[in-house]
């Protein structure tokens, strides 16, 4: 049986919020079967919980924000991408502020944290959402689509009219049956253009952003001294974001996601449309792991 997974141990980290610039303490904790991923604002009394579900998404400008009443958690997508990539079904994410720390701008540090905590299988079947037919949302020339696929595949195309990106790969397709999330996607960093950063800062966004946690691009090239981690790091980061946004379904997917210039808002619209169209998907479990179209790395012992 493919079983649900949680963390073996509690683990902590410190970072800054990308948009707020505030110092944030992050604690990842094991959670019982069928809990899902639940964010907790531990700085509030009483503590406020926000389950990582599509229905709880509020703001989608520049990042994905979860809300519960007037309480929010910003920039959840990179951590959720790491949870999805490692197959974590159940965990508590405690925060000392309203934003998940940006770390280095990728999912890599979160993958390291989760692997350091160790993974533990639980005594219940892992639930997958299998896509049964095409579901699409469009907005202007942007598009996001789910398609049936025996496995998990993410295809993405971006179209930035910028001298640096025009000459680089702006599309990628990753089939996770043959490609490692950890090696090929998790280290892709968020990116920003110098021309936008002043505008963002005027609106109290990207206050914690720097070349330490993003790829910064001006008219002449990439400003980061070490350059890019992947030749197609820009579009790979969009794939990383999409995987995090899709995990707000609450389960791992069996299907293909295709995005054309899609972002957090359109990704969330697609999830809401899918959830509403109950004939477009089904929940499945696998008694025999060898029959599943998706496999996960064996749980690793805590470091």
Curated annotation (Swiss-Prot):
| Keywords attached to this entry | Hydrolase, Lipid A biosynthesis, Lipid biosynthesis, Lipid metabolism, Metal-binding, Zinc
Recorded GO MF terms:
metal ion binding; UDP-3-O-acyl-N-acetylglucosamine deacetylase activity
Q: Where is the active site?
A: 264 (proton donor)
Which GO BP terms, alphabetically?
Answer: lipid A biosynthetic process
Q: Does the keyword Lipid metabolism apply?
A: yes
Q: Which cofactor does it need?
A: Zn(2+)
Q: Known catalysed reaction(s)?
A: a UDP-3-O-[(3R)-3-hydroxyacyl]-N-acetyl-alpha-D-glucosamine + H2O = a UDP-3-O-[(3R)-3-hydroxyacyl]-alpha-D-glucosamine + acetate
- Membrane-crossing segments per the record: none
Q: Does the keyword Transcription apply?
A: no
Q: Which domain of life is it from?
A: Bacteria
Q: Which GO terms describe its cellular component?
A: membrane
| Range of residues in the leader sequence | none
List residues binding Zn(2+). Answer: 78, 237, 241
Query: Which pathway features in its UniProt record?
Result: Glycolipid biosynthesis; lipid IV(A) biosynthesis; lipid IV(A) from (3R)-3-hydroxytetradecanoyl-[acyl-carrier-protein] and UDP-N-acetyl-alpha-D-glucosamine: step 2/6
Q: List, alphabetically, the PANTHER family matched.
A: UDP-3-O-ACYL-N-ACETYLGLUCOSAMINE DEACETYLASE 1, MITOCHONDRIAL-RELATED
State the family named in the UniProt similarity comment for this chain: Belongs to the LpxC family.
UniProt function note? Catalyzes the hydrolysis of UDP-3-O-myristoyl-N-acetylglucosamine to form UDP-3-O-myristoylglucosamine and acetate, the committed step in lipid A biosynthesis.
Q: What is this protein called?
A: UDP-3-O-acyl-N-acetylglucosamine deacetylase
What's the gene?
A: lpxC
């Amino acid at each position: 049986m493919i079983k649900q997974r949680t963390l073996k141990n509690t683990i902590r980290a410190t970072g800054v919020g990308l948009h707020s610039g505030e110092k944030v303490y992050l604690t990842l904790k094991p959670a019982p079967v069928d809990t899902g991923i639940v964010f907790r604002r531990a700085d509030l009394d009483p503590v406020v919980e926000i389950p990582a579900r599509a229905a709880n998404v509020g703001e989608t400008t520049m990042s994905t924000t979860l809300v519960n009443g007037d309480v929010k958690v910003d920039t959840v997508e990179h951590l959720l991408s790491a949870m999805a990539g490692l197959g974590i079904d159940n965990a508590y994410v405690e925060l000392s502020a309203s934003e998940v720390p940006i770390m280095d701008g990728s999912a890599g540090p979160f993958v390291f944290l989760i692997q350091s905590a160790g993974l533990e299988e639980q005594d219940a079947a892992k639930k997958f959402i299998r896509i049964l037919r095409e579901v699409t949302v469009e907005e202007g020339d942007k598009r996001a689509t789910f398609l049936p696929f025996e496995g998990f595949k993410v295809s993405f195309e971006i179209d930035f009219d910028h001298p640096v990106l025009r000459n680089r790969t702006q599309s990628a397709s990753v089939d996770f049956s043959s490609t490692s999330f950890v090696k090929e996607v998790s280290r892709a960093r968020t990116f920003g253009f110098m021309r936008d950063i002043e505008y963002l800062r005027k609106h109290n966004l990207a206050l914690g952003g720097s070349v330490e946690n993003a790829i910064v691009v001006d008219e002449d090239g990439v400003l980061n001294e070490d350059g890019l981690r992947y030749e197609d790091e820009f579009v790979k980061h969009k794939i990383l974001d999409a995987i995090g946004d899709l995990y707000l379904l609450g389960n791992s997917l069996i299907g293909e996601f295709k995005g054309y210039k899609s972002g957090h808002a359109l990704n969330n619209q697609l999830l809401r449309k899918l959830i509403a169209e109950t004939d477009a998907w089904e929940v499945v479990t696998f008694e025999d792991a060898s029959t599943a179209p998706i496999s996960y790395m064996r749980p690793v012992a805590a470091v």
